UniProtKB/Swiss-Prot annotation:
The keyword Nuclease applies. It comes from Anaeromyxobacter sp. (strain Fw109-5). This is Endonuclease MutS2. Keywords: ATP-binding, DNA-binding, Endonuclease, Hydrolase, Nuclease, Nucleotide-binding, RNA-binding, rRNA-binding. The lineage of its organism: Bacteria, Pseudomonadati, Myxococcota, Myxococcia, Myxococcales. SUPFAM superfamilies: DNA repair protein MutS, domain III, P-loop containing nucleoside triphosphate hydrolases, SMR domain-like. Its EC number is 3.1.-.-, 3.6.4.-. Gene3D superfamilies: 3.30.1370.110, P-loop containing nucleotide triphosphate hydrolases (3.40.50.300). It is an enzyme of class 3 (hydrolase). Endonuclease that is involved in the suppression of homologous recombination and thus may have a key role in the control of bacterial genetic diversity. ATP binds at G344, P345, N346, G347, G348, G349, K350, T351.
Length: 805
């Protein structure tokens, strides 16, 4: 790709956007020099790596690259024998730590991001060097006392001397005789020596060493003789500490250089990972996706099958990065066509469309997702050449047309099979007839060389090529005739009018001038242009009709949805009513259970035949109540499922009384209640308990009753269990208390069902269970008689019981 093509398509801006999303200086440098992949397979692999990095980004997992500075310069200086400064060593330590942490992160995610892990696996797993440097050097860059025992000792000696000197100088300042010779009662440090501000006139009164003087010369900074010895000792201690610090820095730099190869390797890997993470962020910001990468010639051979390329919802990436509203376009080149001729009004987006394709081709070559939707397909173009901006050639004193032809000449020389050629306003800026002939010849030459070509034009002769030659295809950018404005949408398969007169009207040229131009155009040929404008008008009319049809369809769909919603509301009301009936039934059942429990308690307290008979009668009444309530609930469910909702509850309307399972006629309505005639009776029921029966609703109700009756009949006709199976109770293994409770429940059920006898299996055992059972049977009001089983019945291991009737 020539520098000119990259510049004209805006490739440097893409690289700048990528670099801005990298965090390492080395990563940014690598992004700005991002290479193009040599093969289609390499491009697929690069896109897959970006896809894995994007997966990490979507999981909010950022690579741990913090703190790594521009260490390339540090490593180079150390390799030449230089001693690194403390902060430089800290940055190198950050590199070692980032390498270990990044390796650990990607190893843990190896199953999700296998390619990234393969790239990161050579990273150094140990951060021992980083630990050593960070223990010796504080984040501020100061060398820590922990760096060595010698340094700690020298610094402690220095601190002790500072304390002694400060105490001595403060004693001198407090001396009244000394104060008479001082400019002020303070001390300062000059040349690492404690000094006093002595009046120049009192110089001989304060013996010592003069280290400095004020600008006026009236004040001398004197180190008193009594402090010189301590000052010398402090200088020696500081020198020892400084020498130890330099020794530590030399030692750490040496340790760094001993591992310099690994550090350089780690830096290269981290920079590559940083670029991949930046690529993932860029793809996310562009809503970009990896296209299917085709070989350079897939679908582009004359007579070949399939699409040469297809970019769905394509957007110009630079416009997206600028935050502008971008109208997406669907760009496709179908075989056998090899050239796409884009026409339409000025400012309609023709140049944007073809440069977006060119940038997409470059991004794919560099392994970057393109600003198009999933499902897009794009060849791995061997070369991309563009002539969309000749302003640079104008500085060479070339005319616009001459500069354009020079660019075309360069492209003709470089056009090879599998290349992509982009030309904006081909052969414009000259006589239209000659320009059209030249443009057609250029296009044919490029196509014959095996290139895929995208051009923009206003020349009618080029628009007509696709009508007679399958190697060419038309596309147009839309124009809204009512608003006199472009739509920026690309439409495939047809040419577009330049709409120059409409654009002139839009920018505000005088109306008489515009009308004169329109009349002149109509009277002086331009048949293809007029046909294109008529075609645009017809398209606009059809689009309006389609919008009207879609609006009517949407209205019908919404009406149908409202009807369904109303029906669902009615059915929901039925279900809620059934639920309320179920709750009422549950309350009745609970009350009945409580009553039965009370009867049983009384029966156990007074075990008489009369009491048992009364209990059985009460149980029969309870069962009848439960059956009636269940029948009403079933009727309500049937009504909710099969009655046709509709109409309102008003006098004269036939309704189903859900809770009673009966039909009737509404006599009157009073608020939320209604009076209903059901046969010879009149009942007052809540309106919510009534379902209007309209049309076939009565048949549905009958059907519901018929089905309910059949189900009940089927239930009643169900074959009974094998003889004796329901009249047998096995109590082996139970404790006495459990046995008595089970036997009482068993006898109660059989007595209520009208059974005559039963068999209780208790086994032989120790005989205690059998004796407890028979003692209980002797006192039971349910039992008429009992005996040990016959031999064929199980002998004394069973007890046969005859129930009292």
């Amino acid at each position: 790709m020539t520098d000119r093509t990259q510049r004209e398509l805006g490739w440097p801006e893409i690289l700048n956007a990528l670099a801005a999303r990298c965090r390492l200086p080395a990563g940014r440098n690598r992004a700005l020099a991002l290479p193009f992949q040599p093969t289609a397979e390499a491009a697929r692999e690069a896109l897959a790596l970006v896809g894995e990095a994007r997966r990490l980004s979507e999981l909010a997992l950022a690579l741990p690259l913090g703190g790594v500075g521009d260490v390339e310069g540090h490593l180079e200086r150390a390799s030449k024998g230089g001693v690194l400064e403390p902060l430089a060593l800290r940055e190198c330590a950050a590199l070692a730590r980032a390498a270990a942490r990044t390796r650990g992160l990607l190893e843990a995610r190896a199953s999700e991001t296998p390619r990234l892990w393969a790239l990161a696996e050579p990273l150094s797993p140990s951060a021992a060097l980083a630990d050593r440097i960070e223990r010796a050097i504080e984040p501020s860059g100061a060398i820590s006392d922990r760096a060595s025992a010698e340094l700690a000792q020298a610094r402690e000696r220095s601190r002790g001397l500072h304390r002694a000197l400060k105490a001595q100088v403060e004693t001198l300042l407090a001396d009244a005789d000394m104060q008479r010779h001082l400019r002020d009662t303070y001390f300062t440090i000059r040349n690492e020596r404690y000094v006093l501000p002595v009046l120049a006139s009192a110089r001989r009164a304060v013996p010592g060493i003069v280290h400095n003087a004020s600008q006026s010369g009236q004040t001398l900074f004197v180190e008193p003789d009594s402090m010189v010895e301590l000052g010398n000792e402090l200088s020696i201690a500081n020198a020892v500490a400084a020498e130890e610090e330099q020794r530590i820095l030399r030692e750490l730099t040496g340790a760094l250089m001993a591992d310099s190869g690994a550090l350089a390797r780690d830096l290269g890997i981290l920079a590559a990972l940083d670029v991949l993470e930046g690529s993932a962020l860029l793809a996310s910001d562009l809503d970009a996706h990896a296209p299917e990468v085709l070989s350079p010639f897939d679908g582009l051979r004359v007579g070949g099958a399939g699409a040469g390329f297809e970019l769905l919802s394509l957007r110009h990436p630079l416009l997206v990065l600028q935050g502008k509203k971008v109208v997406p376009s669907h760009v496709r080149l179908d075989a056998p066509a090899r050239a796409l001729i884009v026409s339409g009004p000025n400012g309609g987006g023709k140049t944007v469309a073809i440069t977006a394709v060119g940038l997409s081709a470059l991004m794919l070559r560099a392994g970057l997702p393109v600003a198009a939707a999933e499902g897009s397909r794009l060849p791995f173009f061997l070369e991309v050449k563009a002539a969309v901006d000749e302003r640079g050639d104008l500085a060479k004193d070339l005319s616009t047309f001459t500069a354009h032809l020079a660019a075309v000449k360069e492209m003709l020389a470089g056009a090879v099979p599998g290349s992509l050629i982009l030309v904006d306003e081909i052969a414009a800026d000259t006589d239209p007839r000659e320009g059209a002939a030249l443009a057609a010849a250029i296009l044919e030459s490029l196509v014959e060389r095996g290139a895929a070509v995208l051009v923009t034009t206003h020349l009618d002769e080029l628009k007509a090529l696709a009508l007679t030659d399958p190697r060419y295809a038309n596309a147009r950018v839309g124009f809204d005739a009512e608003r006199l404005a472009p739509t920026y949408q690309l439409h495939l398969g047809s040419p577009g009018s330049s709409s120059a007169i409409e654009v002139a009207a839009r920018v505000g040229l005088p109306a008489p001038l515009v009308e004169r131009a329109r009349a002149a155009l109509t009277g002086h040929g331009g048949a293809l242009g007029q046909a294109l404008r008529a075609l645009d008008d017809e398209r606009a009319r059809l689009a309006e009709e389609r919008r009207a049809a879609e609006s009517a369809r949407d209205a019908a769909r919404k009406a149908e949805e409202r009807a369904r919603a109303a029906e669902e509301v009615a059915r929901r009301a039925q279900r809620e009513a059934a639920a309320r009936m179920g709750e009422a039934l549950a309350d009745e059942l609970e009350a009945a259970r409580a009553e039965v429990a009370e009867l049983l308690a009384g029966l156990q307290a007074r075990p008489t035949v009369k009491a048992a008979t009364d209990a059985a009668r009460q149980l029969d009444a309870w069962r009848a109540t439960v059956a009636q309530a269940a029948k009403a609930t079933q009727a309500r469910a049937d009504a909710g499922a099969e009655a046709l909702p509709g109409g309102e509850v008003r006098p004269g309307v036939r309704v189903r009384i859900v809770s009673l399972g009966q039909e009737g006629e509404v006599v009157e309505v009073d608020g939320k209640d209604a009076l209903v005639r059901a046969g010879p009776l009149k009942v007052r029921r809540p309106v919510a308990d009534l379902v209007p029966l309209l049309g076939k609703a009565k048949d549905a109700a009958k059907l519901g009753r018929s089905r309910s009756e059949k189900l009940q009949a089927a239930s009643e006709a169900r074959p009974s269990a094998p003889p004796g199976l329901e009249r047998r109770l096995d109590v082996r293994g139970l404790r006495v208390e459990e046995l008595l409770r089970e036997v009482e429940r068993f006898l109660d059920r059989l007595y209520s069902d009208g059974e005559a006898d039963c068999l209780i299996l208790h086994g032989h055992g120790t005989g205690a269970l059998k004796q407890a059972l028979r003692d209980h049977l002797s006192a039971s009001p349910y039992v008429g008689a009992f005996r040990a089983g016959d031999r064929h019945e199980g002998g004394d291991a069973v007890t046969v019981v005859s129930l009292r009737r």
